[in-house]
Amino acid sequence: MRKELEGRLVNLAQRINQLCKKLDGSFISEHLSKQIIRSSTSAALNYGEAQGAESKADFTHKVSIILKELRETQISLKLLSDSVKENAKDDMNFCNDECAQLVAIFHKTVITAKSNK
């Protein structure tokens, strides 16, 4: 499960990077693409940090950061929806769906981690 989640987070960050290359080039899409690349890669990188957590509290904190970054990514995707060219619709749909699934997984993980204190 750990490697699968890591792979999904890395894949999401890579697909978002590809998506950002296909945006319309407007000021807002340029601005948001930089932000969404940061938030999606942060989620993947923080997953590695969570795997090396020093305590249950540290793990819970790091997983909470992953969830926050994924939620930020979700909102950025919504804001970018008008800037997506026709050739990027599939990438946008994949990123939206995958991000929603990962938010649900990490939301449950945070709840479980907090209840196991």
Predicted segments with their positions:
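Short, C-terminally biased terminal segments at protein or domain edges
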Residues: M1-L45, E49, A53-K117
